[in-house]
A protein has these predicted regions:
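Generic detector of well-ordered alpha-helical packing
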Residues: 43, 47, 66, 84-87, ...
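DPxDG-like acidic metal-binding loop motif
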Residues: 73-135
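N-terminal subdomain of lithium-sensitive/metallo-dependent phosphomonoesterases centered on the IMPase/IPPase/PAP
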Residues: 1-85
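An extended, acidic
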Residues: 142-212
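Short loop/edge segments at beta-strand edges and connector loops
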Residues: 64-66, 136, 178
Length: 213
């Protein structure tokens, strides 16, 4: 498993370099659906990760936000679950709140996670039973016991839509942040106490970060 962590870390850094080369520069934006943008930075990083990870692990399955899904992955015991750019809206807005997210599931359970913020050079990694790390240093969640002392980190769009207005008084602070993966990584490293989402998520949003927690 250590070899797979090293592979995923190397892939995440290289994909992050692709994203960094486009950040606050020129790129194309298309829309997969309502309020669901995708850039050529997303697709280029996705193509790189698919080639890098599957060439090293040809017997593994593949599930990515930016790749066409295939039922063949359901026949595989191990599946890479990837979001090449988690936080596309933040990327487009010029905010450094986005991640390369690489998870590995074994028999349907997350066992490895690597997340990389290429602007802040934050590399989060974990594999099952071995703890979580940020740039090589062990990290852990806070020991906050009560909601009144908790720093809640939430989606910026949910704050803008005032979805949290009825619940603000329960928490010490509400901090906006893009990227589900980044929010969970910040909780795992003790920089926030709780993340709650009021909207549904996909496997590629949470698989890698699940391992950090």
């Amino acid at each position: 498993m250590k070899e797979l962590v090293s592979l995923a870390e190397s892939a995440a850094r290289a994909a992050g370099a692709i994203l960094r080369s486009y950040f606050q520069q020129e790129y194309t934006i298309t829309h997969k659906g309502l309020d669901d943008p995708v850039t050529n930075a997303d697709t280029e990083a996705d193509a790189f990760l698919k080639e890098k990870l599957l060439s090293a692990c040809p017997d593994y399955g593949w599930l990515s936000e930016e790749s066409a899904d295939s039922a063949e992955r359901l026949t595989k015991s191990r599946v890479w679950i990837v979001d090449p750019l988690d936080g596309t809206k933040e990327f487009i807005a010029g905010r450094p709140e986005f991640m390369v997210s690489i998870g590995l599931a074994e028999n349907g359970q997350p066992v490895l996670g690597v997340l990389y913020n290429p602007i802040n050079d934050e590399l989060f990694s974990a594999y099952k039973g071995q703890g979580a790390f940020l740039n090589g240093s062990r990290i852990s969640c806070t020991q906050t016991k009560t909601l009144s002392e908790a720093r809640l980190i939430v989606s910026r769009s949910e704050l803008i839509e005032n979805l949290w207005q009825p619940y603000r008084h329960f928490f010490k602070t509400l901090q906006p942040c893009g990227s589900v993966a980044y929010k969970l990584a910040l909780v795992a490293s003790g920089k926030a106490d709780i993340h709650i989402s009021l909207k549904p998520k996909n496997e590629w949003d949470i698989c890698a970060a699940h391992c950090l927690l």
